[in-house]
Amino acid sequence: MPTEIENINPNVYDRIKERVLTANEEDENVPDPFDKREIFDLIRNINDPEHPLTLEELHVVQEDLIRINDSQNSVHISFTPTIPHCSMATLIGLSIRVKLLRSLPPRFKVTVEITPGTHASELAVNKQLADKERVAAALENNHLAEVINQCIAAKG
């Protein structure tokens, strides 16, 4: 975790209501393709590395910035750091990626990128997040893996 907070007073947004599961969604015999809301529900409660808030509360992740194509096995997440020079952007992106890789079936190709035009180092961060070897190497770093696990751990 950082020793000095970059954005000491971030905007905080209301959480959206929890989704009520339908009988069809709970029935294992009914085909139920993944949708944007289901993906959002997986990442909305990721903890911000700087603040005691979730990525949803900071509008870092939003349902309308998720694209999913269940039949083509692809998920694309755009996330928006709270400030354009956020040094935590790569860590946030890694946390989103790890949460989805651990939660979704392995058939999915997961892409995590910064929302275009919202970060000073957008291209460099996106390149790091897209590089499977760099992501794997980052997760082999015990300290970094511990921080990511803290971000994706459920509170309470």
Curated annotation (Swiss-Prot):
Pfam families: FeS_assembly_P. It comes from the Eukaryota. The keyword Cell division applies. Disruption phenotype: Embryonic lethal. In 0-2 hr embryos, mutants display signs of incomplete chromosome segregation during mitotic divisions likely due to defective organization of spindle microtubules. InterPro entries: FSCA_dom_sf, MIP18, MIP18-like. GO terms for cellular component: cytosolic [4Fe-4S] assembly targeting complex; metallochaperone complex. GO terms for biological process: cell division; chromosome segregation; protein maturation. The keyword Cell division applies. Keywords: Cell cycle, Cell division, Chromosome partition, Mitosis. Component of the CGX complex composed of crb, galla (galla-1 or galla-2) and Xpd. Interacts with crb (via intracellular domain). Also able to interact with Xpd in the absence of crb. Interacts with Mms19. Component of the crb-galla-Xpd (CGX) complex which is essential for proper mitotic chromosome segregation in early embryos. The CGX complex is also required for cell proliferation in developing wing disks. In the CGX complex, acts with crb to recruit Xpd thus forming the functional complex. PANTHER family: CYTOSOLIC IRON-SULFUR ASSEMBLY COMPONENT 2B (PTHR12377:SF0), CYTOSOLIC IRON-SULFUR ASSEMBLY COMPONENT 2B-RELATED (PTHR12377). The name 'galla' means splitting in Korean and is derived from its role in chromosome segregation. Belongs to the MIP18 family. This is MIP18 family protein galla-2. It comes from Drosophila melanogaster. The gene is galla-2.
